[in-house]
Amino acid sequence: IMEYSKERMDDLMRAYDEYISSCDYIRMSEVYKIIVNMPSRRFWVSDIRAALIISAMMRGKTDLSTMCPLKKEMYEEIYNRVFKLQEEYPELTISELCAKVIAQPAPKFYLTPGSAKVMVCKARKQWIQEKWKRLRLL
């Protein structure tokens, strides 16, 4: 279970709602392709995991070629930001730098459209169930 799954879901639903409300005509096949490439509030990875991968990258001890392309792209973006931040804050550890970087807005969600579709459908189903539960209580 992912550490930030609820927050990531809320952020993805924000992007979904934002995109849907901006459309005159909605093509569901396009929705998920677009929202996964919309900016995200942060990088959806734990600071511990990011620090492990980034420190291994800095030592040349990790093979990113075995990673799925989106994860690889995300870690490369984090690595580039950590590298720049390290010049500004040389006294900080890699863990501290990673924690700062992953809290920054990310250029996208680093999810496949298929994963986003599954997540959005699950969230909408939960939302509908909660709405029905509230209606029954009235």
Describe each PLM feature range.
Residues R27-I34, T93-K100:
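A detector of tandemly repeated sequence units and domain arrays
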Residues V36-I53, A99-K122:
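Short, basic interhelical loop/turn and adjoining N-cap
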Residues K117-L138:
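C-terminal engagement modules used by replication, chromatin/transcription, nuclear envelope/ESCRT
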Residues Q86, Q104, Q126-Q129:
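Residue-identity detector for glutamine
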Residues I1-S21, M28, K33-E87, W132-L138:
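Basic, amphipathic alpha-helix used for nucleic-acid engagement in HTH/winged-helix/SANT-Myb modules
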